Design a protein with these regions (language model features):
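Conserved nucleotide-binding/hydrolysis micro-motifs of P-loop NTPases
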Residues: 28-31, 79-80, 120-125, 171-174
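Glycine-rich phosphate-binding loop used to anchor ATP phosphates in small-molecule kinases
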Residues: 48-110
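NTP-dependent small-molecule kinase module
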Residues: 127-139, 143-191
């Protein structure tokens, strides 16, 4: 888990490939409200977050209830991500209804065994976002990334119910540096 552009997908794919385990990636590109949200956040926050909630539930539920899939999986997101983003993006009233629906759905899912929380400087997040080149993300405000960062920290400190480990990627470019990747794996294994 972690902020937008921190490297969740890249790390999950690398670990999945190296350890021959399935990788469950977030279906963000299927959300019909995502691009609209960045243009008009007040108008599209609610449909965006409810779509993500239902899509994440379906994705995790389908995976874990399929008898033909391994129960070991690496994912670039968790179900609780929905709460973190909804708390930032929704009004207090909308969030209350959202949280009730989240709670009804979450009891139907298995909890992850471990969560790895990736951290990165806000400036580097912005660079990573620019490099990956999704047009709708290019004008993302650093204040929004800061809110997400604070939202994750608040959730981890006050609501997290499974073991988690925080890894600061500021000096660990695991994409370009194998030694950095091995250090990350050591942290994960030791956890």
């Amino acid at each position: 888990e972690g902020n937008i552009g921190v490297g969740k997908t890249s790390l999950a794919q690398k670990i999945g490939q190296d350890f021959k385990v399935p990788v469950l990636l977030e279906n963000f590109s299927k959300n019909p409200y995502l691009e609209k949200f960045y243009d008009q956040p007040d108008r599209y926050a609610s449909p965006l977050e409810f779509y993500f909630l239902e899509d994440r539930f379906k994705q995790f539920n389908d995976f874990y209830t399929n008898p033909n899939t391994s129960k070991k999986v690496v994912s670039d997101h968790s179900f609780f991500k929905s709460l973190v983003f909804a708390k930032i993006n929704l009004s207090v009233k909308d969030y209350e209804g959202f949280k009730k629906k989240y709670e009804r759905l979450s009891v139907q899912l298995d909890l992850p065994q471990k969560v790895i929380f990736l951290q990165q400087s806000l400036d580097q997040l912005k660079v990573n976002i620019q490099i990956r080149g999704r047009a709708y993300e290019q004008n993302m405000d650093l204040d929004y990334l800061k809110k997400i960062d604070n939202g994750y920290r608040d959730f981890l400190e006050n609501e997290m119910t499974v073991p988690y480990c925080s890894i600061d990627l500021t000096a660990l470019d695991f994409i370009k540096n194998e030694k950095a990747y091995q250090l990350i794996l050591q942290r994960i294994k030791a956890f």
